[in-house]
Amino acid sequence: MRSKARARKLAKSDGDVVNNMYEPNRDLLASHSAEDEAEDSAMSPIPVGPPSPFPTSEDFTPKEGSPYEAPVYIPEDIPIPADFELRESSIPGAGLGVWAKRKMEAGERLGPCVVVPRAAAKETDFGWEQILTDVEVSPQEGCITKISEDLGSEKFCVDANQAGAGSWLKYIRVACSCDDQNLTMCQISEQIYYKVIKDIEPGEELLVHVKEGVYPLGTVPPGLDEEPTFRCDECDELFQSKLDLRRHKKYTCGSVGAALYEGLAEELKPEGLGGGSGQAHECKDCERMFPNKYSLEQHMVIHTEEREYKCDQCPKAFNWKSNLIRHQMSHDSGKRFECENCVKVFTDPSNLQRHIRSQHVGARAHACPDCGKTFATSSGLKQHKHIHSTVKPFICEVCHKSYTQFSNLCRHKRMHADCRTQIKCKDCGQMFSTTSSLNKHRRFCEGKNHYTPGGIFAPGLPLTPSPMMDKAKPSPSLNHASLGFNEYFPSRPHPGSLPFSTAPPTFPALTPGFPGIFPPSLYPRPPLLPPTSLLKSPLNHTQDAKLPSPLGNPALPLVSAVSNSSQGTTAAAGPEEKFESRLEDSCVEKLKTRSSDMSDGSDFEDVNTTTGTDLDTTTGTGSDLDSDVDSDPDKDKGKGKSAEGQPKFGGGLAPPGAPNSVAEVPVFYSQHSFFPPPDEQLLTATGAAGDSIKAIASIAEKYFGPGFMGMQEKKLGSLPYHSAFPFQFLPNFPHSLYPFTDRALAHNLLVKAEPKSPRDALKVGGPSAECPFDLTTKPKDVKPILPMPKGPSAPASGEEQPLDLSIGSRARASQNGGGREPRKNHVYGERKLGAGEGLPQVCPARMPQQPPLHYAKPSPFFMDPIYSRVEKRKVTDPVGALKEKYLRPSPLLFHPQMSAIETMTEKLESFAAMKADSGSSLQPLPHHPFNFRSPPPTLSDPILRKGKERYTCRYCGKIFPRSANLTRHLRTHTGEQPYRCKYCDRSFSISSNLQRHVRNIHNKEKPFKCHLCNRCFGQQTNLDRHLKKHEHENAPVSQHPGVLTNHLGTSASSPTSESDNHALLDEKEDSYFSEIRNFIANSEMNQASTRTEKRADMQIVDGSAQCPGLASEKQEDVEEEDDDDLEEDDEDSLAGKSQDDTVSPAPEPQAAYEDEEDEEPAASLAVGFDHTRRCAEDHEGGLLALEPMPTFGKGLDLRRAAEEAFEVKDVLNSTLDSEALKHTLCRQAKNQAYAMMLSLSEDTPLHTPSQGSLDAWLKVTGATSESGAFHPINHL
């Protein structure tokens, strides 16, 4: 409760001291102070002494009364000791004052008065100042006190006493003259004490002098090397500040106030500096003492009228900028640049850099002007300064926060652990962390097709989903063929809307073992067929439309083309006899009723919009992962399911019979299948084995054009495989580069159908009974008859027929069958073959060559210049084209997208080695089992479990042989960096990177020294990069470090520089292929001489394989280093760069899978390329004279050839002379040709040369040959 306070009117005279220096605003101070002080609280009335008039007359004293009164409000709740009282002060306009009620002797101490320092005050003219109702004032007391020192340093103290804690001390007023002073003040820490300096009588007011206040101890000296001193004239005692000197003179020097500081704390006593020995330089203005004249002259600047350098945080001003900077350091301690090599601190990074250069030789002298961090090189500083730039290209897709460095973004992403899966796919419900990963997933999503039928499709063509898309309907007879992509790679998103092929039914489709090798958005593709009314016809329309024959022949009925577009599409391909009647009747009717549907589908036959990113999908691409526009193989099963979806188009069978007759079109199931279809279901798929051989072999065809195929069709017969790879989706290959023959490009129309039963064979009639002939081909060209396989003939239809996987079977199937095989394989012998299903001969008179198709074929994006000069030789010189075909480097080694095949087939290869352990579940094979880096024909449960136990990345689907590899790879997605440097704040995802960082950065180890300039480097890659500069300076190749000379006199880079050679592969690619072409052209003209050279070269190759400088001898070291480099690039490089895309023979996958093969004992069945070279070394008499082997390895791995390929690139990078290049390229070409031959001959026994060279090649390519033996090619 507040109560009224009594007020008196003070006397006012005409002599108001308006100009009094102690009262600049008398009315404001007087009235407000009284009011506010009276508002604090209430107490009982205090007797007020006689009013004190203004000291304007000698008649009046502060103790005398005054006839005038002014209103003074006395607070009633001030806790004041009994020895004192509050009443009207004798100082005019000061308000209340403290008056003594008892006698006080000198030396008594009052206090403390707790205050809080402040940095600003209203007035700077007064030593003491009371300001009421100020915003900076303590809210409960309302008083701010400013204490100033005449040298310009001020300290402001706000009364911080709580209510009832001695706040009465603030009412001690300032005396008008020094004679009236009876108190002095001293500050200890944040407390103020009052000391009585002379006796105070009762009724006398307590006063201090205006110039005597609580002064801080000293000021900042102008220079750090000088100590300011002040000398007493009487006793020659030195003091640190003028305040100390004045106190000394007033209270201690002489008899005046000698006992002033007795009883006070030792801190209050001035510390004398002792008598100075020598002449002292004193400032006449401020009496400061300096040790030398120069210091005094520097000091005299401060006494000028105007100070140019003013502090923006306090009222201080300086004449020297250095003093201002030094002073500002006291305000902001964070702007200090400390030397890392000594204790000095600098305010400017340039001074720090200058200091390091002059005092610390070799230290990091490049300092950042923003943060002061130092770097050893200017490039390091430049890279660091990106942190302070405003450009932040790396944006978090979750919270959209941007960063200047990719590593910072990766580190930031770890903060989103709780929201990394907040973006949901609206179709399948799968969660994703970023929009880019969601967009990537939607291309493969299982929910529905996200791509409208445009571009390669006819406009407006509806895409009807297949009933097989339902994941809840797995086939009861699920086995390997139906275990598609997701069975082998359970976590890899299956390319849902990725088209396998955009060709009409004449084009084979990519089989389900390797879906989505080429994403649809990777390369632009023009429409393969122009939109026509035929393509725009509605689905399920019953028009007997005809597909325009691209071969220039009479148009075929669409039903004819479509019925054979997918082997197993119709029930006519049923495996059992009870379905044969439907093969003849109902199935053909279904096809007729869906003729327009098939015609539409023919334009996107292999658009496998397998929508499956569902990691739980178990049926894979073989069944439920068929595309929305693909066929549903179930709809054509022999059980008569309704045809609701669109058929799976692939290499079908051209029907024998009238081209316009739909009813006479019997559709046969091709024998070219690695897995016979089960009884319940016929799926239009083939195993991954067929896919890999067809894909790889067809890619090989791609690089040599149709020239060899024309010769093959005329003279050699068909290859042992059919071109089933969708080169319409290869990157823009021109028409002249298409590897398919005209017949191969029109599989569904041009390939002969095989009768499935005697009754089907009789339906063909005439010569077609022995050899069903294709009406779409011209009968003037005759193809040779392929030899019958050596295996046993097929048993009767009632018996169980083992799989026929021999090369001869593949060759026959490529002629007779379509490009599609059953998606379901046969595990336990339930597949029953008809008597006519054995091994029918192929009619030689029915296989003419067809004119080329005239579809729009894009051109390759990086191979165009290679084939500009080679195409002319292919048709005129078949043998030369054949050599050119196989002597070229394997496309898998260079095509960036082929690394996907390498990755997928590598994982499938391990299944081959397990076939010996699962013999109880596998039937004996009468022929040599075909196993080209693919799973065996049947997979038992342990095999399937082993396939699922692969360590698969859940983000990108990559598969790793060990969990450690997967763990390290996952850090590239999550950004996790668990290895932190103990010396700095950097962290790493790989421990080896941390060790290298500590070794190079902190330990300053530089073990790699350039022998040309003696410069040292911390990493081998830096040394290699440095050596390239010497190469440009025309340094001899033999002097380059990392380059070893082999037996041929050529050079190859050491493994440590292999990564740099990979980086230059793209630049050297054109020259590389150009040299190969030139070499092949020369070898064609000098066959006799090259035969001798190649014998010698092969021996040298065998010797060079043992050279310690080759990468094959140090693969483990290279693997570890490459892994580290790749991981580091994933973390710190710019986003979007991929190591695997720039270098086709990616070192990391190769090394990873080699480790996997080392772990699996069963993989020892695979005969590597090194073993091939050892075999050749045993027989030095011939180029490829190998000892007879009963069976060749089941896991032939072209990776071994890829490992050798880097030697050629290293040779190119070393810029060797042309002669040495020819030798090396010859060796590499022969190695790869040998690898290709082995890939096609696999289990064929190898003998010494005993037959003509052409016959050997014919045998390799599956053409007519008298012997099953494989012969070396010494004549090439």
Curated annotation (Swiss-Prot):
ZnF (C2H2-type) residues: 230-253, 281-303, 309-331, 337-360, 366-388, 394-416, 423-445, 951-973, 979-1002, 1008-1032
Segments of skewed composition (Low complexity): 609-624
Pfam families per the UniProt record, alphabetical: PRDM2_PR, zf-C2H2, zf-C2H2_6
BP GO annotations: brown fat cell differentiation; heterochromatin organization; methylation; negative regulation of DNA-templated transcription; negative regulation of granulocyte differentiation; negative regulation of transcription by RNA polymerase II; negative regulation of transforming growth factor beta receptor signaling pathway; positive regulation of cold-induced thermogenesis
Subcellular location: Nucleus; Cytoplasm
Record's GO cellular component terms: aggresome; cytosol; nucleoplasm; nucleus; transcription repressor complex
Region (Mediates interaction with SKI and regulation of TGF-beta signaling): 739-1276
SET domain residues: 82-211
Known tissue expression: Expressed in uterus and kidney. Expressed in both cardiomyocytes and interstitial cells.
Keyword terms, alphabetized: Activator, Cardiomyopathy, Chromosomal rearrangement, Cytoplasm, Differentiation, Disease variant, DNA-binding, Metal-binding, Methyltransferase, Nucleus, Repeat, Repressor, Transcription, Transcription regulation, Transferase, Zinc, Zinc-finger
Catalytic EC class: transferase
Region (Interaction with CTBP1, CTBP2 and ZNF516): 679-1038
Primary residence: nucleus
Effect of E271K: In CMD1LL; uncertain significance
Record-listed E.C. numbers: 2.1.1.367
Compositionally biased intervals (Acidic residues): 1116-1133
Composition-biased stretches (Polar residues): 561-570, 1047-1058
GO function term, MF aspect, one: histone H3 methyltransferase activity
Chemical reaction(s) catalysed: L-lysyl(9)-[histone H3] + S-adenosyl-L-methionine = N(6)-methyl-L-lysyl(9)-[histone H3] + S-adenosyl-L-homocysteine + H(+)
Positions of the UniProt region annotated as Disordered: 1-68, 533-657, 772-804, 1033-1065, 1105-1163
Function of the molecule: Binds DNA and functions as a transcriptional regulator. Displays histone methyltransferase activity and monomethylates 'Lys-9' of histone H3 (H3K9me1) in vitro. Probably catalyzes the monomethylation of free histone H3 in the cytoplasm which is then transported to the nucleus and incorporated into nucleosomes where SUV39H methyltransferases use it as a substrate to catalyze histone H3 'Lys-9' trimethylation. Likely to be one of the primary histone methyltransferases along with MECOM/PRDM3 that direct cytoplasmic H3K9me1 methylation.
Family recorded in the similarity comment: Belongs to the PRDM16 family.
Identification of the protein by name: Histone-lysine N-methyltransferase PRDM16
Native organism taxonomy: Eukaryota, Metazoa, Chordata, Craniata, Vertebrata
